[in-house]
């Protein structure tokens, strides 16, 4: 199944702009390039192993989704993919789906994880999914904060060195308030960035300073 959706401009927490859209099969080379730019730590936190290269079988599965039981979004800075998020339904007609995302090192800490989670949850609800589940290493504090800060009612279990999270993705007043607050702060930073002086220009002075 294919689906055409417009590219969405996304304002990040630092006031910069990226774009988000559903993944495409033609994204495979860009996904490989992004993976090569990851630090060893980023790879380990996402895949729970060194995972130096993406096997062809995994790559094919990553970029081919049905937009119902499996969905994925990519985030682009210019023409370069810098993040990807996905969910996959746990079984036929299951109300649960596993969610995961990874952000290139240079773009971490700018709110991309929260943006991906929001769009994935919206898409999942339209496909009849009720709950997200996630497995996160305890060392991945940034990922745990993304889930915790979103306002979802999260159930946590720790087993075999992994934090297991389960949470309903229906909007609540808490999640909507978090989204509104994030949008307000992001817009404020964007305006401040736009109005920040780029330098001082002295009018009426020649290049030699002689008037």
Where are these regions (language model features)?
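Long, contiguous binding/interaction regions
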Residues: 1-193, 197, 203-206
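Glycine-rich phosphate/diphosphate-binding loop of Rossmann-like nucleotide-binding domains
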Residues: 209-211
């Amino acid at each position: 199944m294919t689906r055409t959706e417009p590219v969405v401009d996304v304002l990040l927490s630092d006031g910069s702009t990226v774009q988000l859209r559903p993944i495409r099969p033609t994204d495979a080379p860009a996904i490989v390039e992004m993976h090569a730019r990851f630090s060893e730590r980023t790879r380990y936190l996402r895949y729970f192993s060194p995972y130096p290269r993406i096997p062809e079988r995994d790559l094919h599965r990553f970029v081919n989704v049905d937009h119902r039981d499996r969905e994925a979004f990519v985030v682009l800075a210019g023409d370069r993919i810098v993040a990807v998020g996905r969910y996959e339904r746990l079984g036929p007609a299951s109300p649960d789906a596993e969610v995961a995302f990874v952000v290139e090192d240079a773009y971490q800490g700018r709110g991309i994880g929260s943006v991906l989670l929001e769009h994935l949850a919206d898409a999942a609800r339209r496909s009849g999914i009720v709950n997200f589940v996630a497995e996160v290493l305890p060392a991945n504090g940034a990922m745990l904060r993304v889930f915790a800060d979103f306002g979802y009612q999260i159930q946590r279990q720790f087993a075999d060195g992994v934090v297991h999270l389960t949470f309903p993705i229906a909007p609540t007043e808490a999640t909507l308030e978090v989204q509104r607050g994030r949008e307000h702060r992001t817009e404020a930073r964007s305006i401040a960035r736009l109005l920040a002086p780029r330098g001082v220009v002295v009018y009426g002075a020649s290049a030699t300073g002689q008037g």
